[in-house]
A protein has these predicted regions:
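A surface/extracellular/periplasmic glyco- and lipid-processing/surface-interacting theme
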Residues: 31, 35-39, 43, 53-58, ...
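Catalytic His-Asp segment of secreted/periplasmic serine-dependent ester chemistry enzymes
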Residues: 68-160
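Well-ordered, non-membrane alpha-helical segments in soluble/globular domains
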Residues: 32-48, 77-88
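Amphipathic, non-transmembrane alpha-helical secondary structure
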Residues: 2, 39-46, 50, 138, ...
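Active-site segments of SGNH/GDSL-like serine hydrolases
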Residues: 17, 48-83
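Oxyanion-hole/transition-state-stabilizing segment in secreted/luminal serine hydrolases
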Residues: 1-38, 65-70
């Protein structure tokens, strides 16, 4: 981040859909673990928040993770993913700092658990299709502009 914050005033973090393949917690969270578990993600996000706040002149936009199509995940994994992204929006993200969220997961799922079939490349492929991408592109653009204009804490997290 030291290099990027020296070059950019706004930095956007994006995850690919495998971030949503969340396994059950073990009761032994580990910030250094590469295991995809809510307990680990929360510690990692808290560490990331501390680091990002050490660059107050830079604004950071964190996408909620991408959803998976129903055929590519289990209901339990999808529920854990939604639980984590809800925590990111409602608890981790705090007003008044330099960190903002774009709720991509909400756009993909429309409040459900899975990437909607009509937004996916196919019922087996969790990549967003061209039609959905064309719908989402102006929304992330609007979200970025809202953050730049100082409206990041009051504007819609989806860009709608």
């Amino acid at each position: 981040l030291e290099i990027l914050t020296g070059q950019y005033q706004v930095i956007v973090f994006k995850h690919c859909y495998p971030v949503s393949s969340i396994k059950p917690d073990t009761g032994k969270p580990d910030v250094s673990s590469n295991e995809k578990r809510v307990e680990n993600y929360k510690l990692q996000y808290e560490a990331l928040k501390t680091k990002m706040r050490s660059f107050p002149a830079t604004r950071f936009i964190v996408w909620t993770g991408a959803a998976r199509v129903k055929k590519a995940t289990s209901r339990d994994e999808a529920e854990r993913a939604r639980q984590f992204f809800t925590w990111v929006k409602n608890d981790w993200d705090e007003p008044g700092d330099n960190i903002f969220v774009w709720d991509f997961h909400e756009l993909e799922t429309e409040g459900g658990l899975y990437l909607k079939d009509e937004y996916a490349v196919s019922k087996e492929d969790s990549h967003p299709n061209k039609s959905f991408s064309m719908k989402a592109a102006p929304l992330i653009s609007k979200r970025i502009v809202d953050v730049i204009q100082g409206k990041g804490d009051v504007a819609s997290l989806t860009g709608k």
